[in-house]
């Protein structure tokens, strides 16, 4: 029997890179709320006592960047100088400028349906039937752990927790089927007055056990809870944070390939984001239709050109029809031009800040997670 291990990691909303992602997407949402046709590319840098927000924007909207930044940091939980970062006292620098007219010229069209891609690039979408949400299990449960850390921090169950945390889960597979969890790593920032033994017990009882299915845990499962023994200094005081540095956490935890483009701070004309969402939508509908157990779709674009330069599909030997048939079905049922996918998924609206922590995929509140095309795909495939 073929056995293997596979590991994915996640980080909490208080991780420095995720603070940056959330600020970038908060700015994007605030602009889209006033101007759905805005062009936004917003990058954020955070370090002890400061936030730098930069990028390129073309819009009729006005947004109070400083107030928005402070509000976002406050909601995450950095509200005291003891943590090395305080929403009310940190410096906020605004370096946002206008998008190049050369890019506008390539993207905008008299007929909006012929809108060109905002850049060249390649994007991947993936789905697998190993979980109910058609996502790989390692990233799904890595997200669930840090999301739970945030919940018990905010509701007072574990009041000594602080916002920065990381998780990592290693699953054991036999013949590509899950047989158990081999190892769990959870590192969480904490106040200085909690003993290591109490922290380990609290994390195990209030975070790990409520989240991970008992049937996958065994006496051989290894647990690493704050393995350095101390994690008081964290967040932007521990490390600087940048938008777009957690692209594997944001997607499939390494289980699928990645085109390299980050998501946060980008409006839907940027195919790095919108086409990756559409590719997930396509792959998920193919798996939901029963046309494959696993599906990875690649799509690519040229700047200023509407039609994708390529579409390819890999089903890892699990396809019920050929990959040529699947590509034909994709072209028939999904409009992957930039305008088409924005319309198909209703992307020109302020829905992005919620994506910026705990993964962009596998969360049914987002439109790219719908499986409304599955029935038609199955019928047209003749199954």
From Swiss-Prot:
Residues engaged in binding K(+): 43
**GO biological processes:** one-carbon metabolic process; S-adenosylmethionine biosynthetic process
Answer whether the UniProt record assigns the keyword Chaperone to this protein: no
Q: Kindly give the InterPro entries that the UniProt entry links to this protein.
A: ADOMET_SYNTHASE_CS, S-AdoMet_synt_C, S-AdoMet_synt_central, S-AdoMet_synt_N, S-AdoMet_synthetase, S-AdoMet_synthetase_sfam
Q: Which Pfam families match?
A: S-AdoMet_synt_C (PF02773), S-AdoMet_synt_M (PF02772), S-AdoMet_synt_N (PF00438)
- Binding-site residues, Mg(2+): 17
The EC number on file is 2.5.1.6
**Hey, which pathway is this one from?**
Amino-acid biosynthesis; S-adenosyl-L-methionine biosynthesis; S-adenosyl-L-methionine from L-methionine: step 1/1
State if Nucleotide-binding is listed as a keyword: yes
Q: What does the entry list as the binding residues for ATP?
A: 15, 164-166, 230-231, 239, 245-246, 262, 266
Location in the cell? Cytoplasm
Which residues lie within the region annotated Flexible loop? 99-109
Disulfide links within the chain: none
Write down the chemical reaction(s) this protein catalyses: L-methionine + ATP + H2O = S-adenosyl-L-methionine + phosphate + diphosphate
Looking up PANTHER family in the UniProt record yields: S-ADENOSYLMETHIONINE SYNTHETASE
What family name appears in the similarity comment?
Belongs to the AdoMet synthase family.
Q: Describe its assembly.
A: Homotetramer; dimer of dimers.
- What's its job? Catalyzes the formation of S-adenosylmethionine (AdoMet) from methionine and ATP. The overall synthetic reaction is composed of two sequential steps, AdoMet formation and the subsequent tripolyphosphate hydrolysis which occurs prior to release of AdoMet from the enzyme.
Q: What protein name applies here?
A: S-adenosylmethionine synthase
Q: Which organism is it from?
A: Shewanella sp. (strain W3-18-1)
């Amino acid at each position: 029997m073929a056995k293997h291990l596979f590991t994915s990691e996640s980080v909490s909303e208080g991780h420095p890179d995720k603070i940056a992602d959330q600020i970038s997407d908060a700015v994007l949402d605030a602009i889209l709320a006033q101007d759905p046709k805005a062009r936004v590319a917003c990058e954020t840098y955070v370090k002890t006592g400061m936030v730098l927000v930069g990028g390129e924007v073309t819009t009729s909207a006005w947004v109070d960047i400083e107030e928005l930044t402070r509000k976002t940091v406050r909601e995450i939980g950095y509200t005291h100088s003891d943590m090395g970062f305080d929403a009310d006292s940190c410096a906020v620098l605004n370096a946002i400028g206008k998008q190049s007219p050369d890019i506008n010229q390539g993207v905008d069209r008299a007929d909006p349906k012929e809108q060109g891609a905002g850049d060249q690039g390649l994007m991947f979408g993936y789905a697998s039937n190993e979980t109910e949400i058609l996502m790989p299990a390692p990233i799904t449960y890595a997200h669930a752990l840090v999301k739970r850390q945030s919940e018990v921090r905010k509701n007072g169950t574990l009041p000594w927790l602080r916002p920065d945390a990381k998780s990592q889960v290693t699953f054991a597979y036999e013949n590509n089927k899950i047989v158990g969890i081999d190892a769990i790593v959870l590192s969480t920032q904490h106040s200085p007055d909690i003993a290591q033994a109490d922290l380990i017990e609290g994390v195990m009882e209030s975070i790990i056990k409520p989240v991970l299915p008992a049937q996958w845990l065994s006496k051989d499962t290894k647990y690493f809870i704050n393995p350095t023994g101390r994690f008081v200094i964290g967040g932007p005081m521990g490390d600087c944070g940048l938008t777009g540095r957690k692209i594997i956490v944001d997607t499939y935890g390494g289980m699928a390939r990645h085109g390299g483009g980050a998501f946060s701070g980008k409006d839907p004309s940027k195919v790095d984001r919108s086409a990756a969402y559409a590719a997930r939508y396509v792959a998920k509908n193919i798996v939901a239709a029963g046309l494959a157990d696993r599906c990875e779709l690649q799509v690519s674009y040229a700047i200023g050109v509407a039609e994708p330069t390529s579409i390819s599909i890999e089903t890892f030997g699990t396809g019920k029809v050929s990959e040529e048939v699947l590509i034909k079905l994709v072209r028939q049922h999904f409009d992957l031009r930039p305008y088409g996918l924005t319309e198909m998924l209703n992307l020109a609206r302020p829905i992005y800040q919620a994506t910026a922590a705990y993964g962009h995929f596998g969360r049914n509140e987002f439109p790219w997670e719908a499986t409304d095309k599955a029935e038609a795909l199955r019928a047209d495939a003749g199954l």
